[in-house]
């Protein structure tokens, strides 16, 4: 927080019922889906010091079964890259990004990092977990839906959360859902900075 900034008070808690009363919000910018050749995407991503970050894994409904990560989402202003991960292979460009000084803002990042380390050993750097930030700020409501509601004033849909992220082609709804999650993380971080909390 700069010396001239004044904190704008933020509600510290919101109920599930209050969240459900809010209008749905979603990312309306450009969505770029890539299956390989990630280098050009990171030329663009590397121009930014703060990015939104999320991952998706095909859900499993059998006890003890664990699927590999299928998608990594990186948000920059006005654009979200959806990086498809096939056969558990994380591209070297992604590793460079994960180990870089670029801030990567997400929610529940320990699970994301653990899933990525199952595929490839790396040293994560500059990862900012909004759940941990919320705890430090005394915000009782955590998770993307509640933090988006508190900070951004809209409801994030989770309708595609349990869809198949290994589909040959992602549906329009999947793309929008995945992009919205990463974008919302970036927007929450920016809003907290704007209000003088970071």
Q: Language-model segments: which ranges?
A:
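N-terminal accessory regions of nucleic-acid-interacting proteins
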Residues: 1-51, 115, 119, 130, ...
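Two-metal-ion RNase H-like nuclease active-site motif
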Residues: 50-58
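Conserved DEDDh/DEDDy metal-dependent 3′-5′ exonuclease domain
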Residues: 30-37, 46-50, 62-158, 162-177, ...
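Short linear motifs in intrinsically disordered
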Residues: 10-12, 59-65
């Amino acid at each position: 927080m700069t010396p001239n900034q004044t904190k704008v008070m933020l509600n510290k808690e919101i109920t599930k019922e209050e969240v459900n009363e809010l209008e749905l919000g979603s990312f309306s910018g450009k969505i770029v889906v890539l299956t390989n050749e990630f280098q050009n995407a990171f030329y663009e991503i590397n121009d930014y010091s703060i990015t939104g970050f999320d991952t998706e894994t095909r859900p499993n409904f059998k006890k003890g079964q664990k699927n590999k990560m299928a998608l990594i989402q990186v948000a920059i202003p006005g654009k979200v890259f959806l990086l498809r991960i096939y056969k558990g292979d994380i591209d070297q460009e992604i590793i460079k990004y994960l180990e870089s000084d670029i801030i990567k803002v997400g929610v529940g990042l320990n699970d994301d990092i653990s899933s990525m380390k199952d595929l490839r050993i790396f040293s994560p750097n500059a990862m900012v977990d909004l759940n941990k930030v919320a705890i430090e700020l005394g915000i009782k409501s955590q998770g993307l839906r509640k933090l988006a509601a508190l900070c951004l004033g809209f409801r994030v849909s989770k309708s595609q959360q349990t869809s198949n992220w290994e589909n040959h082609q992602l549906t329009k709804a999947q793309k929008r859902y995945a992009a919205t999650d990463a974008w919302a993380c970036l927007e929450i971080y920016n809003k907290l900075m704007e209000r003088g909390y970071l």
